[in-house]
């Protein structure tokens, strides 16, 4: 009898639906293509997609599960007319380019709806003003610091 009850409990546990949220948990550089669907722990109720600018033409994408959402949550798609998305595209001087918080399975899989983050900069990259002298002096100091400190000149 105890065996039968244990068997029913084990089989019944498989029928219980999990309320855990599934989010993509990954990080990538210059691409939104990373995907790693993972079940979030019970206390983490939101999926997050954050894009941060590191350099002018280099950005970092992070997809995570999170406990809190500091921005308004994006609603799941439905058959009703869709509401305006609550995604944020942030311009200078902030390092965050795009931020999305949502609460349905795998909702943080895609990046912004347009390629606004990848605006081409006017002019050629080689035509921009560079400070080669500062780079040269910094490199010179790094290369000669050991020798100068040995001579007690630095």
Swiss-Prot record:
Transmembrane annotation, as ranges: none
Topology versus the membrane: Lipid-anchor; GPI-anchor
Keyword Signal: yes
Compartments it resides in: Secreted; Cytoplasm; Cell membrane; Cytoplasmic vesicle, Secretory vesicle, Acrosome
Residues of the signal peptide: 1-20
Record-level GO BP terms: binding of sperm to zona pellucida; flagellated sperm motility
Tagged with keyword Nucleotide-binding: no
Covalent lipid sites (GPI-anchor amidated glycine): 123
Keywords: Cell membrane, Cytoplasm, Cytoplasmic vesicle, Glycoprotein, GPI-anchor, Lipoprotein, Membrane, Secreted, Signal
One GO cellular component term: extracellular region
InterPro entries xref list: LY6_UPA_recep-like, Snake_toxin-like_sf, Sperm-ZP_regulatory
Domain UPAR/Ly6: 21-117
Function: Required for sperm migration into the oviduct and male fertility by controlling binding of sperm to zona pellucida. May play a role in cell growth.
Stated name of the protein: Lymphocyte antigen 6K
Native organism: Mus musculus
